Amino acid sequence: MQESGLKPILWKNKELILLDQRVLPGTTSYITAKTLEDCIFAIREMVVRGAPAIAITGAFGITLYWNSLVSKPSFSELKLKLSELLESRPTAVNLRLAIEEFSSRFPESNYSSFSLEEIQKGAEELALFMLSEDLENNLTLSKYALSLFPKQPSSLNIITHCNTGALATAGHGTALGVIRSLRDAGHSLTVFADETRPYLQGARLTAWELQEEKIQSFLITDNMAGWVMSSRKIDAVIVGADRIASNGDTANKIGTYPLAIVAKHHGVPFYVAATAKSMDFRIPNGSYIPIEMRKEEEITSFGFLKDSDGKPLLKEGVIAPKGMKALNPSFDVTPASLITGIITEKGIVSPVTEENLKKIFQSI
């Protein structure tokens, strides 16, 4: 099974180099993050996006913060910096877990016993481990996913939503990684990629990755999924996850929930592909997941997509009457009852229940 050659996150000469996903597919350019503040900006402004990639960027942001110091800050100062990082994108649990992992290695109870050099080294080791671990876990969950489909090469039609490929992870992908692995296993694929309004991750990023991989695909608007399922045989819907509650309720990019409802109506298997880092056993169900609300202009205009110099990528224009208010939740929650199975690096959870999730993740 081959990993994607695309590397959206690079650590080189003690600097973090990020593929600027705001300017894809028209331009391929990288930005260099030299400070924690640079990483927070990159996360908040979606230079980098996707729960795993956000967490990895955050871990390197912590490394950059420590590397910038000549003396240790007070623990209260450190907590403030970590809090600022956590607030950059609140819905995905992966970033919080990365911060908690760092904090567990250098806890307040014996913070004074660690030297500046020890923390600098430990922070970098953690970030590098997260980078390699995510890639390995993505490849492993993709192997498990193959068991859900015919062993013999077949023609498969799959719908996916948002972007869950190399761009959203350390380099292979979750849901899109599964699709890539199905292709590598000899299946003939046709992928229907939702454009994913309003930020167009499907149109700009998933479509680009599919073309790069030479996988036959069609871009569809989010509200075409029902027509596609009713007019041809769809073998599966495969999506990613930003946070999965104890009972299996799953937060993912806005538009996932109605896609699951339509899949249920048409009898199409609906799979979530995610690593253990997206599990949150501290919350009982999806109602406890905070939903990030983004800027109204992402709904009412085209000007929100900007290049690295802050210039609009598309011709500036308003698509709603002046003064029109808009709601812009970045995520919705799909109830576990609509999910056929959750594909993880530990195995496949099906049916999706709290008992089955805890059974497979008992080591967490």
From Swiss-Prot:
InterPro entries: IF-2B-related, IF-M1Pi, IF_2B-like_C, Initiation_fac_2B_a/b/d, M1Pi_N, NagB/RpiA_transferase-like. It comes from the Bacteria. SUPFAM superfamilies: NagB/RpiA/CoA transferase-like. Substrate binds at residues 49-51, 89, 201, 252-253. GO terms for biological process: L-methionine salvage from methylthioadenosine. GO terms for molecular function: S-methyl-5-thioribose-1-phosphate isomerase activity. Pathway: Amino-acid biosynthesis; L-methionine biosynthesis via salvage pathway; L-methionine from S-methyl-5-thio-alpha-D-ribose 1-phosphate: step 1/6. The keyword Nucleotide-binding does not apply. It catalyses: 5-(methylsulfanyl)-alpha-D-ribose 1-phosphate = 5-(methylsulfanyl)-D-ribulose 1-phosphate. Keywords: Amino-acid biosynthesis, Isomerase, Methionine biosynthesis. The record marks 162 as: Transition state stabilizer. Its EC number is 5.3.1.23. The active site is at 242 (proton donor). Belongs to the eIF-2B alpha/beta/delta subunits family. MtnA subfamily. Catalyzes the interconversion of methylthioribose-1-phosphate (MTR-1-P) into methylthioribulose-1-phosphate (MTRu-1-P). This is Methylthioribose-1-phosphate isomerase.
